[in-house]
């Protein structure tokens, strides 16, 4: 047996398409408890040249969460630890290295939800704080303490300057934007700024020509944010994690720097209730506990409340089919997105159930499903790392799949079984991740 720090290094060749076999098959004492950690670095525009860095940061995030679980921490502590690692990486669009808005500032969104208490904390358009998830976590913790003086209700969601002031007043240190800006995010900002200026010049010229020649309606200039070969900074990605601890509690969290060149004050799905993440312990033995984290275009995910929709779908017996149907019916074909040419979204879902004595000898199974359908208008990457944890078994297996331009369809699966692992009570985990980018 090996722990996470000594487990097999990340391998570049791992893919859901070429590795559908078992990645773990070991036996653990039935009296040993376990947990499960799943993290992602987002569904967005990733640089292939940084694939190694993306995989390494996901591995480190799994390690941090596992360390908390080993120390007896609950799911909420573990998911926070994973997000801190993701936010601290200069290669993710969260915390340090986040996309800059049109004013050249960093404004971050983050939220966290505890499945045990059902409490939630979130921040939006937050500047001046290195780790937005810490503020979201503190907001969640404060709501658990009850009402404030004079019977005031404590906030669970703060934005902008008020969120920054609240964070500092609660002992979270401030961090200026220049210290959170990396050379990659700054170069991306300058490149996009030049594109915007050029587009405005072209548009002004066309309008003048149209007015003089009465040409009527203008041709659209085009999407200046479409990624070129030289531009790897146009990230839609929201990083996130879902965790179940040894007691069966689930938790989920997300964090994002938002769209590149966004308007100041814009808040994406990472902060919205039921849109960025969802976690809910089963309240009945006939129900499943679920934890969800989403990534993609914030506006699309907000209008469909995808995180909560996926959680609801997981209450059916066939988790795999239910998730695919939820993505199709509640997202791709959603009437709330009927006017969109291309909807962009991804989701990781963890579900677990407390099983009876007769089921304790069954395998613990996890399914990761990457599905893409329709016509992809851009190169879209999805980085997902699966981290499986038990006291004597710990594995971190990164997976990378690129959705290329043109029509792509089908389904790729990765299955693994851990034989003979049991708990008090016994839990069975199902993990599904879906990334979708359909065209018209």
Protein language model features and the residues they cover:
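Alpha/propeptide regions of enzymes that mature by internal proteolysis
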Residues: 2-440
């Amino acid at each position: 047996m090996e722990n996470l720090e000594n487990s097999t290094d990340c391998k570049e060749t791992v893919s859901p398409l070429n590795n559908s076999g078992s990645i773990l098959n070991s036996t653990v004492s039935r009296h040993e408890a376990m947990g499960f950690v799943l993290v992602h670095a987002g569904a967005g525009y990733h640089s292939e040249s940084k694939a190694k860095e993306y995989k390494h940061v996901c591995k480190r995030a799994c390690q941090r969460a596992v360390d908390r679980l080993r120390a007896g921490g609950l799911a909420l502590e573990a998911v926070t630890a994973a997000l801190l690692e993701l936010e601290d990486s200069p290669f993710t669009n969260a915390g340090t290295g986040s996309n800059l808005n049109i004013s050249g500032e960093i404004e971050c969104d983050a939220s966290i939800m505890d499945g045990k208490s059902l409490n939630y904390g979130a921040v939006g358009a937050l500047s001046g704080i290195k780790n937005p998830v810490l503020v979201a976590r503190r907001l969640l913790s404060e709501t658990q303490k009850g009402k404030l003086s004079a019977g005031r209700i404590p906030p669970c969601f703060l934005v902008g300057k008020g969120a920054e002031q609240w964070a500092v007043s609660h002992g979270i240190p401030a961090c200026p934007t220049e210290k959170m800006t990396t050379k990659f995010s700054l170069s991306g900002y300058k490149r996009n700024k030049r594109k915007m200026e050029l587009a405005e010049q072209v548009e002004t010229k066309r309008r003048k020509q149209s007015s003089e020649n009465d040409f009527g309606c203008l041709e659209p200039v085009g999407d200046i944010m479409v990624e070129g070969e030289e531009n790897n900074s146009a990230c839609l990605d929201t990083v996130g994690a879902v965790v179940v601890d040894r007691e069966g509690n689930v938790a989920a969290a997300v964090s994002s720097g938002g769209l590149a060149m966004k308007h100041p004050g814009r808040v994406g799905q990472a902060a919205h209730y039921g849109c960025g993440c969802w976690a809910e312990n089963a309240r009945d033995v006939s129900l499943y506990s679920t934890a969800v984290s989403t990534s993609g275009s914030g506006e699309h995910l907000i209008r469909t409340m995808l995180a909560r929709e996926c959680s609801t779908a997981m209450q059916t017996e066939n988790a795999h089919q239910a998730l695919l149907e939820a993505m199709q019916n509640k997202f791709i074909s959603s009437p709330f997105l009927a006017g969109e040419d291309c909807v962009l979204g991804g989701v990781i879902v963890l579900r677990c159930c407390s099983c009876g004595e007769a089921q304790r000898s069954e395998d613990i199974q996890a399914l990761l499903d990457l599905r893409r359908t329709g016509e992809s208008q851009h190169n879209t990457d999805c980085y997902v790392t699966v981290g499986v944890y038990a006291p004597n078994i710990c594995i971190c297996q990164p997976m990378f799949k690129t959705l290329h331009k043109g029509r792509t369809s089908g389904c790729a699966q990765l299955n693994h079984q851990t034989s003979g692992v049991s708990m008090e009570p016994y839990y069975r985990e199902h993990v599904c991740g879906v990334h979708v980018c359909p065209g018209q």
